[in-house]
C-alpha cells in the first residue's frame, strides 16, 4: 500500500496536539531553548520560512529526544508600515489586516509538523504585549537608559517617519526606497552608546556566533583611538576654536584644509546671514544622510573664506571649507584634510585645487620623492607598515603608522593642544516614529509638569481604532480626541506623545517574553531564570547589525531593570545564520529588449507554450516581481510536508543557499516512498550483523552531524542506512530493529513518516517520545581497514582487507589487483612495502 502523506501527516499532527507533546514545561530536566527569528505576518509563508523553521525543528526534536525540556515557541513581529500601506491601498484597518494574515500564516505553518508550543504564541501588537513593552519602557526611563533630545534625524519623506541609521540603506529608506533627508526633531533615544565598549568587548565571548556576524557588529560599533585637538580661528570672536577629532594625527603636517559638516554650529551661524551658504547646506541635505551614502556621493565643498591657524605653526593658515562628506554625529563635525594619505581628501583637494603635501612615503624616500608619489593618488599603507616620515613631527623618521599615531598623541598632550581619546561610531538609538501602527510611547506632555511618564496603572496606552489613512503622515496627530489626556503627576490637562516606537523595539526583547508570555509583568523571573538564555538562535545574516545588536542592548537593559538575570546579558548563546532559498528565473525579452519574466509552470523544456525559448538565470533569490517564487502550500499539498522538509535539509550545507528544483523535490519524494516500502515489506526471518553495525554507525554519524548543524550530512547517512537495509537479507526483529533506529534518526527531519515507520517496525508509543538511540562503541569498530596503494609515490588504488591479515596475503592481493597491474605495465616490483593498517608502497 503506497504512503499517502495527505492522510498520514494530519493524523500524526492531531496525535501530537492531543497529547500536548510540545508544551514546554519547567521541571527537573535540563532545558534547551531553540528559537527561530519570528516572522512578519505578510500573509503568506515562503520557502525561506520552511527552511528556517525546519532547521529549528530538527534541533528542537533532537534535543527533546536527548532528554531536554525544550522551549520552541512561535510569535509574530506584527507592527510596522506594511499594514498601514495595506490600509491606504485596500481600505480597512491595519489591525484587521495583521490578524487576518496571522491566521492565514498560522494555517500554513501548522501543516509543516513543527514541534512548536503554540500555547505561548503572541503577536507584538497584542494588547498584553503592548502593555508590558510600555512597562519596560517606563522602567528603562527610570533607570536612565532613555533620553529625549533634539537631534538631526533621518527623515523618510514618503513614509513620513524617522529612520535609525541602520535603517537607511545606500541613502534610501529601508522600506520605502525614498532618498532620506536630514531633519531636526525632538526624539526619544535609547542610550545604547553608553554600552558601546561593553557590547564590543563581549563579542569575544560569543564563541557560538559566526565570526562574520561578530566582525560586522565590531565594525558597526567602531572603536577608534585618536587625537582631539583645537584649531584657533582667525578673526572669528564668536567661534574662537574649532574642535577636531582624528585617528591619523601623524598626518597633521600634511594638512591643507579644514572641513566642517553642513550641520556644524559655525556653518549654521554662517547660513543665517549668507544665502549662498544656506543654499549649499540645503543642497547637501538632498544627497542622503548616512556614512555610506555620503562616501559614494560626489564630493562637494564651499569655501567660507575663513581660516584657522595650524597648531604646530601659528603662521600657517588653513582654509575653512564646508563639505558634504563630513558627518556631525561622528567625531566633532569637523576634520582636517590630509589629501596625500586619504582617498576622500585627495579627491576633494584635486577637485578644488588645494595643496597635496606628503607626510610620509615608502621606506627610504626623501621629501621630493614622497610628494611625487602622492601627486596623482594618495599613499595609504597599512598602519602596521613601516614608512619614512618626510614631514614628521613626533617619533622616529622610520616607523609604523601605529607608532607614529601614538607619538603624535603624546606630542599633542605634552604641548597642550590636544588629548588622546577613544571614540565609538555607535550612536544612540532613536526610536520615535511618526506612524500609527506601532507601540505608543507611554508619556504625556503637560504645560505645568513638562514631559511626564504615564502611570503604570494606566497601561496599556492603546491605539485608537477610528483613524483614517487617506492622507500621508501620522493619524495620531490628526485624531480629534486620542491625544487629550490627564497628567498623572498634577491631574491637569495633558497631551499624549503621538510618536510610536520603532518596530525594532518589539523584536528586541520578544525572546524573553516567550519564557513567560502570560505574565502580568514583562517577565516572570522564576520562568525566565529557568529558560534563558536562548541556546540556539536561527535567522538570516541580514539581521547581523540591526536586530541582534539591539537585542544585546535590550538584554543588558532588562538586567539593569531586574527583568532578566545577570547571566542573560548576552541573550543568545549560539547563533546560526542560514542561507537563502533560490530558484531559477525564466525570462524572455520584449521588442525593446526589456526583460519579461515567466512562472516556472509556464516553461516546459526551456520553452513557453508558443515555442518561444526562455533565458534561464540560475540560483536567483526568490522574488515576486521575477516570478520565481515557489509556494510552500502547493508543495505540501502536492508532495507532503516531509518531502519539503527533507529537500530543504538534504541539498546543501544549511549556511549556504539552496536552489529549489522540481526534480530535487521529486527525488526527495521518491526516497521517502522507498523508505516507506522498506517498512511495509518486512521479511520474516534472517539476521545480519553487518546491518546492525551499519545502524549503529548511522546513530553515531547522524548524531554528530545534527549537533554540528550539518543536516545535509545527516541526510546522506540516512540514505546510506536505507541502502544497507535494502541490500541486507535480514528479516524479522533484526530488520525491525534497524528500521526503528532509522525512524528515530529521521524523526527530527521527517517526523510524520518516522512515526509510520516506527509503528510498523514495532516501536512502543510514538517515536516523538522515544529516547534518542545511543551507538554501541563495540559496533563502531570496523573489522576491516582500507589501505591506499601508492605506485612510485603516487596513489593509484586502494583495497579493503581484514585488520589482522598477514603481510604476505596483503602483498598477494595487491599484486593481483587489476588497477595495480595496469600501472605496473607488466614490470616486476623492485620493492613492495606494507605498513600495517596504513598504506602499501610499490616501487617499479
Curated annotation (Swiss-Prot):
Q: What is its EC number?
A: 6.1.1.4
Classification via CDD domains: Anticodon_Ia_Leu_BEm (cd07958), LeuRS_core (cd00812)
Catalytically driven reaction(s): tRNA(Leu) + L-leucine + ATP = L-leucyl-tRNA(Leu) + AMP + diphosphate
The entry's localization annotation reads: Cytoplasm
Question: Looking at the keywords, is Protein biosynthesis present?
Answer: yes
User: What are the UniProt keywords, alphabetically?
Assistant: Aminoacyl-tRNA synthetase, ATP-binding, Cytoplasm, Ligase, Nucleotide-binding, Protein biosynthesis
Task: Quote a single Gene Ontology cellular component term.
Answer: cytosol
Query: Might you name a Gene Ontology BP term for this protein?
Result: leucyl-tRNA aminoacylation
**Chief localization:** cytoplasm
| Positions of short motif 'KMSKS' region | 621-625
Keyword field contains Aminoacyl-tRNA synthetase: yes
The protein's matches in Pfam families, at most eight in alphabetical order, are given as:
Anticodon_1, tRNA-synt_1, tRNA-synt_1_2, tRNA-synt_1g
Q: Where does ATP bind?
A: 624
Instruction: Output the Gene Ontology terms for molecular function.
Output: aminoacyl-tRNA deacylase activity; ATP binding; leucine-tRNA ligase activity
Top-level EC class as recorded in UniProt: ligase
By its UniProt entry, which NCBIfam families does this protein fall under?
Answer: leuS_bact
Family classification: Belongs to the class-I aminoacyl-tRNA synthetase family.
The protein in question is named Leucine--tRNA ligase
Q: Which organism is it from?
A: Paracoccus denitrificans (strain Pd 1222)
Amino acid at each position: 500500500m503506497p504512503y499517502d502523506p495527505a492522510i498520514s501527516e494530519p493524523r500524526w499532527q492531531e496525535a501530537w496536539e492531543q497529547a500536548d507533546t510540545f508544551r514546554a514545561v519547567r521541571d527537573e530536566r535540563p532545558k534547551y531553548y531553540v528559537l527561530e527569528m519570528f516572522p512578519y505576518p505578510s500573509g503568506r509563508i515562503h520557502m525561506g520560512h520552511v527552511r528556517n523553521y525546519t532547521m529549528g525543528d530538527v534541533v528542537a526534536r533532537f534535543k527533546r529526544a536527548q532528554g531536554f525540556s525544550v522551549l520552541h515557541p512561535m510569535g509574530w513581529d506584527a507592527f510596522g508600515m506594511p499594514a498601514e500601506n495595506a490600509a491606504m491601498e485596500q481600505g480597512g484597518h491595519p489591525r484587521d489586516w495583521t490578524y487576518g494574515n496571522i491566521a492565514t500564516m498560522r494555517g500554513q505553518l501548522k501543516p509543516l509538523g513543527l514541534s512548536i508550543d503554540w500555547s505561548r504564541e503572541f503577536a507584538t501588537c497584542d494588547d498584553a504585549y503592548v502593555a508590558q513593552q510600555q512597562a519596560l519602557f517606563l522602567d528603562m526611563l527610570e533607570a536612565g537608559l532613555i533620553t529625549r533630545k533634539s537631534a538631526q534625524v533621518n527623515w523618510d519623506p514618503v513614509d513620513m517617519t524617522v529612520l535609525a541609521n541602520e535603517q537607511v540603506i545606500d541613502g534610501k529608506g529601508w522600506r520605502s526606497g525614498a532618498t532620506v533627508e536630514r531633519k531636526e526633531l525632538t526624539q526619544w533615544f535609547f542610550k545604547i552608546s553608553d554600552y558601546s565598549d561593553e557590547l564590543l568587548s563581549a563579542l569575544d565571548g560569543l564563541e557560538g556566533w559566526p565570526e562574520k556576524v561578530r566582525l560586522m557588529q565590531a565594525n558597526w560599533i567602531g572603536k577608534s583611538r585618536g587625537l582631539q585637538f583645537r584649531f584657533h580661528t582667525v578673526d572669528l570672536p564668536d567661534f574662537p576654536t574649532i574642535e577636531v577629532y582624528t585617528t591619523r594625527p601623524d598626518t597633521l603636517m600634511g594638512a591643507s584644509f579644514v572641513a566642517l559638516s553642513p550641520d556644524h554650529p559655525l556653518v549654521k551661524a554662517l547660513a543665517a546671514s549668507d544665502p549662498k551658504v544656506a543654499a549649499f547646506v540645503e543642497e547637501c541635505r538632498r544627497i542622503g544622510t548616512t556614512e555610506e551614502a555620503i562616501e559614494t556621493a560626489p564630493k562637494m565643498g564651499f569655501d567660507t573664506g575663513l581660516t584657522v591657524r595650524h597648531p604646530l605653526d601659528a603662521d600657517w593658515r588653513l582654509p575653512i571649507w564646508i563639505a558634504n562628506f563630513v558627518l556631525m554625529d561622528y567625531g566633532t563635525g569637523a576634520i582636517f584634510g590630509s589629501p596625500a594619505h586619504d582617498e576622500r581628501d585627495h579627491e576633494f583637494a584635486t577637485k578644488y585645487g588645494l595643496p597635496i603635501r606628503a607626510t610620509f612615503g615608502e621606506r627610504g624616500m626623501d621629501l621630493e620623492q614622497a610628494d611625487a608619489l602622492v601627486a596623482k593618488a594618495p599613499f595609504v599603507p597599512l598602519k602596521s607598515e613601516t614608512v619614512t616620515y618626510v614631514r614628521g613631527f613626533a617619533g622616529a623618521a622610520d616607523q609604523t603608522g601605529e607608532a607614529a599615531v601614538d607619538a603624535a598623541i603624546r606630542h599633542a598632550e605634552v604641548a597642550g593642544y590636544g588629548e588622546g581619546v577613544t571614540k565609538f561610531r555607535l550612536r544612540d538609538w532613536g526610536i520615535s516614529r511618526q506612524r500609527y501602527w506601532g507601540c505608543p510611547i507611554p508619556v504625556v506632555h503637560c504645560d505645568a509638569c513638562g514631559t511626564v511618564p504615564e502611570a503604570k496603572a494606566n497601561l496599556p496606552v492603546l491605539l485608537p481604532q477610528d483613524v483614517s489613512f487617506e492622507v500621508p503622515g501620522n493619524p495620531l496627530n490628526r485624531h480629534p480626541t486620542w491625544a487629550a489626556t490627564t497628567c498623572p503627576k498634577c491631574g491637569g490637562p495633558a497631551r499624549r506623545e503621538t510618536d510610536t516606537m520603532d518596530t525594532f523595539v518589539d523584536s528586541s526583547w520578544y525572546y524573553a517574553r516567550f519564557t513567560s508570555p502570560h505574565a502580568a509583568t514583562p517577565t516572570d523571573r522564576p520562568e525566565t531564570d529557568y529558560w534563558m538564555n536562548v541556546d540556539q538562535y536561527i535567522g538570516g545574516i541580514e539581521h547581523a547589525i540591526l536586530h541582534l545588536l539591539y537585542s544585546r542592548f535590550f538584554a543588558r537593559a532588562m538586567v539593569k531593570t531586574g527583568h532578566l538575570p545577570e547571566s542573560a546579558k548576552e541573550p543568545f548563546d549560539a547563533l546560526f545564520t542560514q542561507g537563502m532559498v533560490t530558484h531559477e528565473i525564466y525570462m524572455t525579452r520584449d521588442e525593446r529588449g526589456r526583460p519579461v519574466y515567466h512562472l516556472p509552470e509556464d516553461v516546459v523544456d526551456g520553452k513557453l507554450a508558443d515555442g518561444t525559448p526562455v533565458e534561464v538565470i540560475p540560483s536567483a533569490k526568490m522574488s515576486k516581481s521575477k516570478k520565481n517564487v515557489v509556494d510552500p502550500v502547493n508543495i505540501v499539498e502536492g508532495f507532503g510536508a516531509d518531502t519539503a522538509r527533507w529537500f530543504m535539509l538534504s541539498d546543501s550545507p544549511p549556511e549556504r543557499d539552496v536552489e529549489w528544483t522540481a526534480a530535487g523535490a521529486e527525488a526527495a519524494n521518491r526516497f521517502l516512498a522507498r523508505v516507506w516500502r522498506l517498512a511495509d515489506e518486512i521479511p520474516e526471518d534472517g539476521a545480519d550483523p553487518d546491518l546492525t553495525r551499519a545502524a549503529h554507525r548511522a546513530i553515531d554519524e547522524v548524531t554528530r552531524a545534527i549537533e554540528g548543524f550539518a543536516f545535509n550530512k545527516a541526510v546522506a547517512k540516512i540514505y546510506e542506512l536505507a541502502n544497507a537495509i535494502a541490500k541486507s537479507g535480514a528479516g524479522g526483529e533484526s530488520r525491525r530493529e534497524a528500521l526503528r533506529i532509522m525512524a528515530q534518526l529521521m524523526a527530527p527531519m521527517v517526523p510524520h513518516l518516522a512515526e509510520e515507520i516506527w509503528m510498523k517496525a514495532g516501536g512502543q508509543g510514538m517515536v516523538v517520545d522515544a529516547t534518542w538511540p545511543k551507538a554501541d562503541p563495540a559496533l563502531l569498530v570496523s573489522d576491516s581497514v582500507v589501505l591506499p596503494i601508492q605506485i612510485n609515490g603516487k596513489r593509484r588504488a586502494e583495497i579493503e582487507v581484514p585488520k589482522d591479515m598477514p603481510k604476505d596475503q596483503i602483498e598477494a592481493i595487491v599484486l593481483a589487483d587489476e588497477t595495480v597491474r595496469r600501472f605496473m605495465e607488466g614490470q616486476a616490483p623492485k620493492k613492495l612495502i606494507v605498513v600495517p593498517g596504513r598504506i602499501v608502497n610499490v616501487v617499479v
